[in-house]
């Protein structure tokens, strides 16, 4: 994902929310 740590954190939170 292009964007940086913030983007990575956002995706990680979304994955955690889904699971």
UniProtKB/Swiss-Prot annotation:
Q: How does it assemble?
A: Monomer.
Query: Which residues are the signal sequence here?
Result: none
What are the record's GO terms for cellular component? extracellular region
GO MF annotation terms: serine-type peptidase activity; toxin activity
Q: Name one GO biological process term.
A: proteolysis
Q: What is its EC number?
A: 3.4.21.-
Q: Which residues form the Peptidase S1 domain?
A: 1-19
| Record lineage | Eukaryota, Metazoa, Chordata, Craniata, Vertebrata
Q: What class of enzyme is it?
A: hydrolase
Q: Where in the cell is it found?
A: Secreted
Q: What is this protein called?
A: Thrombin-like enzyme TL-BJ 2
Family the UniProt entry places it in: Belongs to the peptidase S1 family. Snake venom subfamily.
* Keyword Cell wall biogenesis/degradation assigned: no
Organism of origin: Bothrops jararaca (Jararaca)
**Modified how:** N-glycosylated.
Q: How is its activity regulated?
A: Inhibited by PMSF, but not by hirudin.
